[in-house]
Amino acid sequence: MNNITKFEDITNSLISRRSLIKKGFAFGGLALMSSTLGSITAYSSQSFFNFTKVDCNNNDTITLPEQYNWSVVSKWGDPMWSDVEEFNQTSCGSHESQLKSVGDNNDGMELFITSDNKTLLAVNNEYTNHKIIFSNRKSLLPENKEDVLKGMYAHGVSIFEIKNSNNQWNLVKDSKYNRRITPFTKMEITGPAKGHSLMKTKEDKDGIYAKGTWNNCGSGRTPWGTYLTCEENFNNYFSSSDKNLKSTNELHRYGIRTREIGLNWAKADSRFDLSKEINEPNKVGYVVEIDPLNPNSTPKKHTALGRFKHENAELVISKNGKIVVYMGDDERGEYLYKYVSNESINKVKDKSTLLSNGNLYVAKFNDNFTGEWLLLDTQTTGLSSKAEVCIFTRLAASKVGATTMDRPEWIASNPKKNEVCCCLTNNKNRGIKTNKGGDKVDVDKVNPRKNNKYGQIVRWKP
């Protein structure tokens, strides 16, 4: 990594909404990283979007220029199979209907085209809004096991066929490709952590599979046509029925608490009870690979890509054919990562193994706008095995002195230039207090603002 782009605080400058769209977004947002406001406004006089200006309003709808229109493709609770009743506005559905319906709170998504020219949409269902999904309850919370299960089934991934008819895209019920992936879907564990003692539970004595995925945030896709879904804020779903259970440094580092916060998943499934399954949290916090074209395939949790609060997974092919995956840990004071496969894409038959065998790196930025990728292995981190590096990736990154960042979220590579960008959301703790691991979160050149409310974009050349 070198030639890190200089950041300037442009948040106090006034940029018109339309100018931002025309000159910033037209170049993938990179114009926002120019060194001065003048270079942004002078970036280009060419108009990339020819549409009528839309005035600001606070109407409870989507307002588009008159040349455009919008429509809903799918929404929470839409049945994916014809044997499921239509969404009931009064009951807000049941756990049985939710299992076969579109999940809640869409986040990352990707389109896939099948060999028979069908269009599939893979959508992350990140979390639930209790005030909506449990609006049939006075408490606006899950009040019994069935309620908890309904909330659980609303998490995960929804994969369904969509079809365009008269300029309206709609979900195709009963498509052979339709699939719900939930916190109960069996998944294969791959990479260094597979079979490690830290992955073994009462249900999985060999530590070779995980049960489900949840809090799926951003996404990614592979050149071989599979979907990558990223597990983010997985920590809030665990609790302990034993109030005397003492937390550990590893649990604390990932924000996993013993106190129940209202989701009550442990009441429906004991694996979320830390006093009964202390290793269960080690099975979540990964990038999960799903083949949307094969609804009978088993999803894979790739531990080689590290365990943290993944935002998205930006996968590119390097000049030597190796797979490179850029990833951000979306929490204040956490890190930016890179994974590089051991083999090149044209030398392996099972392309999925490229995400199981490789090396994990974490970014360190210097004050002269250069940087380096620090290898995370047993020698550099002092951890006893590569499996521990992959399970306790945050601890590993802290040990090598990586640069704490201001919530690294979505990462995107430029398909026409040798550069990568990462959006950093904010960090109210910058220059004020450490992260959960006690790492300094000082003001520096790459994170130049104390109490950073607005974030920044970092660009680097691999």
Where is each model-derived feature located?
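Beta-rich catalytic cores
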Residues: 105, 215, 283, 309, ...
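Beta-propeller fold recognition
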Residues: 145-151, 155, 168-183, 334-396, ...
